Amino acid sequence: VTSGVSLGHFTLAPAPASAWANTLSSATTPARVAQPVPVTTQPNVPYAQMPNGIDIASWQHPNGADVDFKRVQKAGYAYVFVKATEGTHYKNEYYVNDAMAAQGNGVLMGGYHYADVSTDAAAQARMFADVIKVKGGASLPPVLDIEEAKGLTAAQLNKWVRTFLQETYNRIGRKPIIYSYRSFLMNQMGNTSDFTSFPLWIADYNGKQSPTLPLPGGWKTWTFWQYSSQTRIDGIQAQNVDTNKFGGTMQQLRAFAATGVVSASKK
């Protein structure tokens, strides 16, 4: 890669030659990942056909209990996002085991970082990248979970997010997913459209079969939708688990895991 990657209203510099991207297959190199193709996920893909998934953290391990991903997969959940890190101080002790167990049982897996915008973004991205470089790596792109402003202005928040996304890309060679909720994107982040070419994972517990439209921040479509935080899942001892929909078919989800791009569905 010899030139920067244009994403939204700012440009990611090319990942260094030594980045972890070089250990990935050619399908996940930055040149391929950086060409998102918008896709209308509804009504082309009926709600019932959108793959279900979960996201978990240490809370889903009460008293150190393991997650039985074989049962999770049989219950109809095709993917999981596992919390890896938070700020510069926390690493999820269950991350590696969860990542390996999920992929060993046919569940697509990605890691997420919970942002602490009161501390350095680049340092957080570096720690996050180090943690998620487990054996085999993650099948889904990395995720930035941004949901606390901690007194920062919209401009300061957006700068923080840019820095984190750039450093994560430098370290991993994959364009991150952005997770947040509607009011945070609209209010704390000023409804910025700077990040619209990054995949959106939106939290919206509206009880419907689609997130509230129009989406915040100028996004034309969503990639993942967290629609509940209170689901009981076979194989997980915790009472409540976050559940999600992927905005496409299972075939598109597998392709997204390989490329970071949601391709248009064939009619």
Can you describe what each PLM-predicted range is?
Residues 127-136, 155-165, 184-193, 218-235:
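Short secondary-structure transition/capping segments
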Residues 140-215:
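Catalytic domains of cell-wall/extracellular-matrix polysaccharide-remodeling enzymes
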Residues 1-9:
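Secretory targeting and sorting signals
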Residues 38-171:
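Substrate-binding cleft of extracellular glycoside hydrolase catalytic domains
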Residues 67-69, 95, 124, 157, ...:
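Surface-exposed beta-strand edges and their flanking turn/coil or helix-capping segments
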Residues 10-58, 194-267:
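Functionally critical loop-and-helix segments that line ligand-binding/catalytic clefts
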Residues 63, 71, 99, 118, ...:
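Solvent-exposed, flexible loop/coil residues
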Residues 89, 118, 185, 209, ...:
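Flexible, glycine-rich phosphate/dinucleotide-binding loops
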